[in-house]
């Protein structure tokens, strides 16, 4: 007989097959899902559509409060492009020289330095101009700021004071201290140009022959040799005057707006002297940068912001901030205007505006300044104690020192090096920078970290050498860098500071600038060394020390 199939077995087998099939199908589905996910993950994702037409703007520090106010008002208005993008300004405060480098590196799409001089620097050496559309929105004349009684001693306000009066005062009074910024700043370069104009007896069309004429160059050199020291710019000068008062300087070159700014903060009043020979202006432009990838919407944002700067609302704000507006419908003699004699300035001045020459002539003015400037003796006092080996600090300091040596460009400047650890060692006497730059760099590169911190002995060594040289016709200065606390000197802090105070009056005035490198530097000691000389102490770290040495180089 044939064997009959068991129905229960058939049913069980069928169920098992269904389960296996379901599992297989499930695994296939999972694998397909993973494959799809990985495919989507590895595939280029669409770039989200932009929601803003952003303009990245760098602006010079002296107009920080004004620019922040303007940008906040513009962004609050929520202007939009025809395509619906929100127009936005992102503004960054930056020194003009750094602004030029950042613009050339593609970091910004617009800039607003204190002078159009910097726009030429942005395009220098480029085949294709980077600077596009530009316009000025605020102006301020270059003036000589003086204490009211100092100006009166020169005949103010009955007499119009000029560069010759300043020269006569500096020659007749050895205690008279005046300054202007380095020619690496717009204010300093415009001042130097004004001096050359005065020496040439011109107000227009200055030529290269005028700059090299012996009578003119002798006049400028005589004036420059009475400068106490130079500096990094007008904002830094005003900050020092606010901190130290009239003992810091008797007269100094800044913009008119800075006189108003200072007088609003102090009971000791400055007056603005508009040189009788004529003066120049800082014109505060805003310029679009033709960066690769600049969009039409970003251009529209620039133009909208430009028009906003020129609007009646913002031009009134410009005037309220102490600048002169470019809108000539706004009267400087309006009762609400800060440009008034009560604030130390004169809305009817300057009577004579000097003509701006070509970029080629301006380059020649700067190179001529290096020949005419007051020469300097500069000692670099360098901490090489054991702690300088930490965090690669010594290597960063060496790079910064070498950068400083590159920045010192005066034809007659001298630089020396005084390293210290357990004691002063391996000193390099003052050398002519133009012929010994490489040798000085080599000595800097040989420095090694070891030992303790004989800071006071090192400063005393450099100070005594400058006193022995007795070269009062030079700027004499010590730039000190230390990362720690004095613990190895034979001279006491009190003995050293008393010697400095005494000899700076009876002997050779020496400026001392101190860098506290890192968080362990003793600023009580550094300030005690710097303050009596008219110098200052500032903090740096491995990321900022190179920039600080570069800033300090502008004082010489």
Language model segments and positions:
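Acidic, polar low-complexity linker/tail segments
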Residues: 40-48, 326-379, 386-393, 406, ...
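Periplasmic-binding protein-like
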Residues: 132-144, 217-224, 266-294, 298-299, 306-329
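VWA/integrin I-like adhesion module and closely mimicked acidic/polar interface patches used
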Residues: 267, 484-533, 538-540, 549-551
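Von Willebrand factor
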Residues: 371-432, 448, 455-460, 474-482, ...
